[in-house]
Amino acid sequence: MRVLSLFDGICCGHLALERAGIKIDSYDAYEIEKNAIKATETNFPDVIQHGDVTKEDFTKYKGKIDLIIGRSPCQGFSSSGKQLNFNDPRSKLFFEYVRAIKECQPKYFLLENVVMKKEWQDIISSYLGVEPIEINSSLVSAQNRRRLYWTNIPNVTLPEDKNITLKDILEDIKFPNPAAIRGRRLNKATIVGRRLDENGHRKDTDKTIPITQCLEVRATNTDKSNCLTTVDKDNVLTPLPIGRHPDAFKNNLPFRYYTTKEMCRLQTVPDDFLNMIPDSAARKALGNGWTVDVIAHILSFLPNEYKEDKTND
């Protein structure tokens, strides 16, 4: 299979193709982040890097590409972002993906993005000519990660639930003061900046109140993590009960971030997949990346002609 990957990141698409049993004849990638490129060059030396999608004339690939894959930057659509939709320069990169499809005319395509307002979803669908399928990564990993997938690969269905929970992927990491929290279960939480009055009530519109970083525990269900992002404090573990706990850092509240190895497991990539780049870059790349087993599941519906011949193994 001849593959064109836009906004390639850490090349999760290549790994997913391998897991789906797809024979890769060529893999051309467009990515500008240096650490992501370094990871790809180490893990997949066959990948040809091309740089910035906005500077490419994709007509050179016309008739030469079987599959275009990509996840155009989602911050403009995300509920955790400012939701600027198509006015956000990052979201406008979606149209580079559309341009690539028009210019190289692949047989198949796959685009991933966040769950968004229906009006924006419909705009993307109108350009791609298909409706998306929504898949939560929780079916194949220990992470809640709802995403939309637009593809013309036929007959894609939801993956079976692998029943993977956090206890299956967490390392044995001790808190600084285990005696103080002995016997308590870990709850998933976030650290959020809030403006609180003297009674601890939210007054977010009152700019005279300083922002305090609150550890917020909203549920005791720890079967799945929150969705990974590029911000560590969006996703933490704590033994504290449900509620809002102010001054998380100042009061040295007991919590910990997911380790990079745990984040790899949440995105279903090998533990050592990003050992060659700085830890901070690896964590950001994982927050931006694909859940590989979801992508592999979708790609498994490609026609058998693209799959590795195992008869001679």
Regions found by a protein language model. Name each.
Residues 1-313:
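Conserved active-site and SAM-binding loop architecture
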